[in-house]
């Protein structure tokens, strides 16, 4: 499944990238993120791997992030892998005519087991909705300084 989401964030591109490119900021806009662990490579750089640990109620989820392209301030691509799903994400950032930032995210989800294949088939909108939630939460963090770290 492939889809594209877009959002305008009302901060200059430089401010957007400074907030987006800091590992410690992820907890402010990725609800449920409880820990991150460097695995390999230079943090945030091409080829770097990081373990992201999320907790949703009593459910724990571990995702491995691998940076696949870094061309800031315009592009940041990464793969996100769990035991059941592989997500190829391509993020594009551009300065708008009014001096803000347009964030376009292209996602491709590849299920790694039958259960996820069925879930992706039956509820594809859940994945797009979650992507949009993260984008809106980043927008709120970047524009208003509102953190989800303790939410």
Positions of the model-derived regions?
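Hydrophobic ligand-binding cavity/cleft-lining segments
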Residues: 1-40, 45, 133-134, 140, ...
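Hydrophobic/aromatic beta-strand elements that line small-molecule binding cavities or substrate pockets
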Residues: 5-7, 38, 52, 63-69, ...
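Beta-strand elements of well-folded, non-transmembrane domains
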Residues: 11, 56-58, 69, 109-113
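A short, structured loop/turn motif at beta-sheet edges
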Residues: 13-14, 41-45, 68-74, 92-104
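Glycine-rich portal/gate segments that line the openings of hydrophobic small-molecule binding cavities
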Residues: 37-84, 133-151
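Beta-strand/loop substructures that line and gate deep hydrophobic ligand-binding cavities in soluble
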Residues: 81-133, 149-151
